[in-house]
Curated annotation (Swiss-Prot):
Assembly description: Tetramer of two alpha and two beta subunits.
PROSITE patterns in the cross-refs: B5, FDX_ACB, TRBD
Species this chain originates from: Dechloromonas aromatica (strain RCB)
Name the record gives this protein: Phenylalanine--tRNA ligase beta subunit
Residues reported to bind Mg(2+): D452, D458, E461, E462
Protein keywords: Aminoacyl-tRNA synthetase, ATP-binding, Cytoplasm, Ligase, Magnesium, Metal-binding, Nucleotide-binding, Protein biosynthesis, RNA-binding, tRNA-binding
């Protein structure tokens, strides 16, 4: 929101400097982004009247001018401006004047003729970036008056960076209210008398979509002179607010929007047919807008139409065919309230925006529509003449402002201030809030222009703003801190992160909303209908809540590969999102924490002491086992859409499924153009944080006995299944069984494979005898034979 300080001070004039006012607004939540003077410093420049112009005898591009500067005698000035002419009133810098750029005007001879001053352009005065000639002033400009005074150049431009909830401050009226409430200064708000109708002409208004447009005011004006010039004071205020002056009728609607915060629109009444309707667009309806863009209007877009055709996108932009021109003499003036939900996002959908949509989608004072149309009528009649008909008002159910309870004790507790009910009542009165006191509590009814007061915390914020954030004392919080004992059965999250970092992994943090394609490629058992889609995504590629962390890690890998990183280790801890009927704390959704990782490139960093080898399934499996040690994990074959069908496993801990590991599926390796298949894993983070409490076990002082055993089994026998079959079936002397070789080929029958195991046997009380070892080995072989049809390899 941009405006001039002089305009604001006509409504409220606190005894503060510009800088003090800027600081006060910022500390009250209305951040002043820029505070700039309208014009740079200069002096001794006055309004001058050009009396005579003759060509310079010695220069083709120069003129010798006789100028009245109000001193009583004509002044000779040599001027090279192409637009200098007799009768013009222009700025004149007198001798001794200091112009922007540290340029001092002196009496000097120009090609033999003495020049006592300089006629100035807007650029030379520093009030415009470009200028093609002298700054021409209105014919009634008083000769001799200081140009700074005449053009009101001792003014400042404020630009506020407003938050979306403060739509009430998108007008001078709203800002004046705020300044008055903050400073206690008296406000002189615009008095808008009702314009008495002088003609009976009117046009019926029909609310076909009352929820989107519950209030519409319209008025016919006739005999209007659209070519009448806009007053200089209005043009100046508009331009200093960042709005270009166009024509008197357009300028009036823009001026009222800035002054009162109510966007208006003017239609050429002769181009309308029948009643005016506020309705939703019809199928295949098209509209040529004022920006010369033709759009196909969607069915959820509110339009203003007559009985035959659409006229405008309601609250956004008017149509070209019903727009006013300099030939317009009869107009239909609109002032309406459009519900924010009916306007929000519609302009962006078509790739443009407007000052009107910026206000309506945030919320416009529904109590100010009638006042705005009266104010605009008043200005149009003063500037353009004409006659006004009666205001036709169509009204449905307007928003109901529900009272909000404020407890004084609650406000004092949140702010840490001993305010008292009387002080709070004074602050609310300064904001023009309607309230009822019930002891130390308040029932506050928000005004029609405040859409941001809905809960008690909103009112506490208002108290803090008016009291002054910088007046609230800084008090350090105090509390009795109790040392929290970390249970042995839980691993702290920071320790798990540190362990992964120690193994060469780097932590990443990705958005929880992802591409729908990632879910299709990497998610397990998630149908298209089960995707959790965002109602209003920030981008099309961020439209779905993730159910797996794999997609983000693959995207991170691609980014690293583009930056020539050949060895990548990544992990992420984050929530995933799943539909579940009984999930808490969010009904219908389960949001578990997951730990996922990715390894790509060499198994080890390049070095002279080790050969180059690509990371594989077993490297990452070892990382997971080290992370969860001393827990013993089980790995079972797994079919997963994201993983290689023969190089993927489900991870189980104490019989519970806690995640998966595997190479990325070849189809996705090809689709995402990866040089090799990365190995990924995803674990239930809560399960990973669970730890086995260490228990004492005696270390044997007697030597172990190691035997090797090779058996032949069917090709389809899975190692884990084979080891599971031994539990409880073999001697207690056997401490460990490790697979050290798998062989298929010569000497092994077809469809068979040879598995070689290293058996470690030991007792804590004595040295084992050969007979005991032989018996244990025979028992082991018998188990292999009976359970899996295994045979000793010859």
């Amino acid at each position: 929101m941009k405006f001039s300080e002089s305009w604001l001070r006509t409504l409220v004039d606190p005894k503060l400097s510009s800088e003090e006012l800027s600081h006060l607004l910022t500390m009250a939540g209305l951040e002043v982004e820029e505070l700039d003077p309208v014009a740079p410093a200069f002096d001794n420049v006055v309004v001058a009247h050009v009396l005579d112009v003759v060509k310079h005898p010695d220069a083709d591009r120069l003129n010798v001018c006789q100028v009245d500067t109000g001193s009583g005698a004509p002044t000779t000035i040599v001027c090279g401006a192409p637009n200098v002419a007799v009768g013009l009133k222009v700025p004149c810098a007198l001798p001794g004047a200091k112009l922007p750029g540290d340029f001092t005007i002196k009496i000097a001879k120009v090609r033999g003729i003495e020049s006592s001053g300089m006629l100035c352009s807007a650029k030379e005065l520093g009030i415009a970036e470009e200028a093609s000639g002298l700054l021409v002033l209105p014919s009634d400009a008083p000769v001799g008056q200081a140009i700074r005074q005449y053009l009101d150049l001792d003014d400042n431009l404020f630009e506020l960076k407003l938050t979306p909830n403060r739509a009430d401050c998108l007008s001078l009226l709203g800002i004046a209210r705020e300044v008055g409430a903050i400073t206690g200064a008296a406000t002189s708000l615009p008095v808008v008398p009702e314009v008495v109708a002088s003609i009976a002409d009117s046009r019926a208004v029909v609310l076909d979509a009352p929820e989107a447009c519950p209030l519409y005011c319209g008025r016919v004006l006739k005999g209007v002179n659209a070519k009448a010039p806009t007053p200089e004071w209005m043009k100046r205020r508009l331009e200093r607010s960042g709005i270009r002056a166009i024509s008197a009728l357009v300028d009036v609607t823009n001026y009222v929007m800035l002054e009162l915060g109510q966007p208006l629109h003017a239609f050429d009444n002769t181009r309308l047919e029948g009643a005016v309707h506020a309705r939703l667009a019809k199928p295949e309806e098209k509209l040529l807008l004022l920006n010369e863009q033709t759009i196909a209007v969607d069915a959820d877009v509110l339009v203003i139409a007559d009985d035959v055709k659409p006229l405008a996108m309601a609250g956004i932009m008017g149509g070209e065919e019903s727009g006013i021109t300099l030939e317009t003499s009869e107009l239909f003036l609109e002032s309406a309230f459009f519900a924010p939900k009916a306007i929000a996002g519609r302009a962006r959908r078509y790739g443009f925006g407007s000052d009107a949509s910026h206000r309506f989608e945030r919320g416009v004072d529904f109590g100010g529509a009638r006042r705005a149309i009266e104010r605009a009528t008043q200005l149009i009649l003063e500037i353009c003449g004409g006659q006004a008909g009666p205001v036709v008002e169509a009204k449905a159910v307007l928003p109901v402002r529900k009272p909000v309870l404020l407890r004084t004790a609650r406000a004092e507790m949140v702010l840490g201030l001993p305010l008292g009910a009387e002080r709070i009542a004074g602050l609310f009165a300064g904001l023009d809030l309607s309230f009822v006191c019930e002891g130390d509590n308040f029932q506050v009814t928000p005004p029609s222009w405040r859409f941001d007061m809905e809960v008690e915390e909103d009112l506490i914020e208002e108290i803090a703003r008016l009291y002054g954030y910088d007046n609230i004392p800084s008090v350090s919080p105090r509390g009795a801190l109790k040392m929290q004992v970390q249970p042995e059965a839980r691993r702290p999250a920071y320790r798990l992160r540190q362990m992964l970092a120690d193994r060469g992994y780097q932590e990443v943090v990705n958005f929880a909303f992802v591409e729908a394609a990632w879910e299709a490629d990497f998610a397990e058992n998630v149908a298209e209908a089960e995707l959790i889609r965002l109602a209003n995504p920030i981008a099309s590629q961020m439209a779905v809540m993730r159910s797996t962390l794999f997609g983000g890690l693959i995207s991170n890998l691609i980014t690293n590969l583009k930056r020539k990183q050949t060895r990548v280790r990544l992990f992420e801890v984050g929530r995933t999102f799943h539909r579940a009927a009984d999930a808490v704390p969010v009904n219908g959704f389960h949001q578990p924490w997951k730990l996922a990782g990715l390894a790509f490139g060499g198994a080890l960093p390049e070095g002279w002491g080790s050969g180059a080898r690509k990371v594989d399934f077993y490297d990452v499996k070892g990382d997971i086992e080290a992370l969860l040690a001393p827990a013993v994990l089980r790995f079972e074959k797994l079919a997963h859409p994201a993983l290689h069908p023969g190089r993927a496993a489900r991870i189980l801990f104490d019989g519970r499924d806690i995640g998966c590991i595997g190479e990325v599926h070849p189809e996705w390796v090809q689709k995402y153009d990866l040089p090799q298949a990365p190995v990924v894993f995803e674990l239930d983070f809560d399960a990973v944080k669970a730890a086995n409490v260490p228990a004492y076990a005696e270390v044997s002082k007697f030597p172990p006995v190691i035997r090797d055993l090779a058996i032949v089994v069917d090709q389809n026998v899975v190692l884990q299944t084979l080891l599971d079959g031994l539990k409880g079936q073999v001697s207690d002397l056997i401490q460990d069984i490790q697979l050290f070789d798998v062989y298929v080929g010569k000497g092994v029958p077809e469809n068979k494979k040879s598995l070689a195991f290293r058996i470690v046997m030991q007792d804590t009380q004595r040295t084992l005898q050969d007979s005991e070892v032989d018996a244990a080995m025979q028992q082991l072989v018998s188990c292999f034979e009976q359970a899996f049809g295994a045979q000793l390899r010859a």
